[in-house]
Amino acid sequence: MAAVINRAFGAEIAADISSYTDVSQSAWYYNDMAVAVNMQTFEGDGSGHLYPENYITREEVFSVLARALVYETDDFSSLNKFADNAQISQWAKEYLSALAQRGYISGDENSNVNPQANITREEFAQLMHNIFKTYISLPSAYSYVNDDSVMINSSGATLVNVTVNGDVVIGDGVGFNPVS
């Protein structure tokens, strides 16, 4: 998950994660975990663990994405529409609520968000599509984008006469280079 989020947002700068006892420097995912910690999408459990080899739950993924997008709220009323809202961990409510308020998560046919279930690749791909209808990764001029949120992860990208009704997210990979 860290690798996918880092690449999607173009994040490259790593933090010192030597205080996390479950991430070996020789592990293939070490740098991705360090970048995710620096990006503040991965926070650990407060006792020195990131659990990099565990499956990731739906509420954990929702939280990672909301932190990456800096979506915050203290209004949890949007969680009331989920039949299983009592299963949402207290620490995750802010993040799930922020995504639900924006319509990015809506629950299944039974109005369940299944926060404790492991997320599948298909569910993750759908969530990313729900958030970013347009993903720009090449330097070029774009005269059409879907009217929802747009992720720009390339310097030199230019939006020409476009209206975006959602968010325009400039990925870390753009750095200080121009986007217009």
Show which residues each predicted segment covers.
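Alpha-helix C-terminal capping/helix-coil junction sites
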Residues: 37-38, 100
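Feature responds to low-complexity, polar/acidic, surface-exposed segments characteristic
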Residues: 2-31, 38-59, 65-93, 105-122, ...
